[in-house]
Amino acid sequence: ILQNLHCQKKPWRIFDYGLAISIFRDNSTRTRFSFASAVNGLGLALAELDEVKSQIAHGETVRETANMISFLTEVIGIRDDMYPGEGHTYMLEVANAISEGYQQGILAQRPAVINLQCDLDHPTQVLSDLLKLKDYFGGWENLKGKKIAMSWAYSPSYGKPLSVPQGIINLMTRFGMNVVLAHPEGYDLLPETIQSAFSFAQESGGSFSQTTLMEEAFQNADIVYPKSWAPMSVMQQRTKLLKAGDKQGLKELELHCLAQNEKYIDWECDDEMMKLTKNGNALYEHCLPADISDVSCENGEVAKSVFEKYRLHTYQEAGYKPFVIAAMIFMSKVKEPVAKLRSFV
């Protein structure tokens, strides 16, 4: 609805004033500007917290910072995705701090906290992926029984978060889809996310399975999502080295991981791999930016020919994100959302 209103150039503001705060602890293009677009559309001004330039650098606590930035703030968006066991915990700490501030009368309103990607999940991204599937296949009811291959793919870089594949297997299994997770041995996701994917599949009537063969996952798939990620053990080791300030250890770990990735350089979504999919014409999805062979790198996640065929689809996929974020904020802030939406139309 919000996207349609935007296309019709109709406003959908719900705030007359106030701030939205973004905290990015990792690089971002799509999510950063999607958050900015969402809060602007809702009527908020945007301020980005630079932790290096704030008193956090001098030891200010999360509890104090969260309250100090929230006096006129309606929403806080956080990306903290690089370190297993850290990102989601930090978001909960911020949420608890501002809840306490609101309950004790320090804050006049309790800001919504939006997960812009953590160590466990990337909800705004995978919801955008889901909306693309809903529109592509013609409705929610048509997703049931569709096979999606969430596959690791080769990348010439290391240290990519686990949150996108974890988010995909835990969202698509809720819609009765047949989700296949493929990765080489050693590139495991967090155990709790695997366990929950099995549970969601059982509840929805779909299925969830794992394989160490990319070809098996692609066989007769309706959707493919080839993306690189770092082994869970590597991310955990990286976190320890960063906390210890061990720069030499980090360099050695990077070299080890790049060499390990090289063993699986043939894990690429190319034309031959796509021929294995249903009618050789599965929908390709990616959170972007993709590592495109002979474009952004010599060898990568996806062949140039495949990416070019689906490029506009991936852009449309990304285009849902501002409205996903806006909807999250809208639903958390509007007491009668249906009536409010009707007032916009």
Question: Language-model features: where?
Answer:
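Glycine-rich phosphate/diphosphate-binding loop of Rossmann-like nucleotide-binding domains
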Residues: 25-37, 134-240, 244-248
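Rossmann-like adenosine-cofactor binding region
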Residues: 199-303
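An N-terminal, well-structured beta->alpha segment
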Residues: 1-13
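A short helix->loop->beta-strand "cap" motif at the edges of active sites that frequently abuts
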Residues: 104-111, 177, 276-285
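Adenosine-phosphate binding glycine-rich loop
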Residues: 277-345
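Short, conserved loop/helix-junction motifs that constitute active-site signature segments
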Residues: 142-144, 173, 272-281, 309
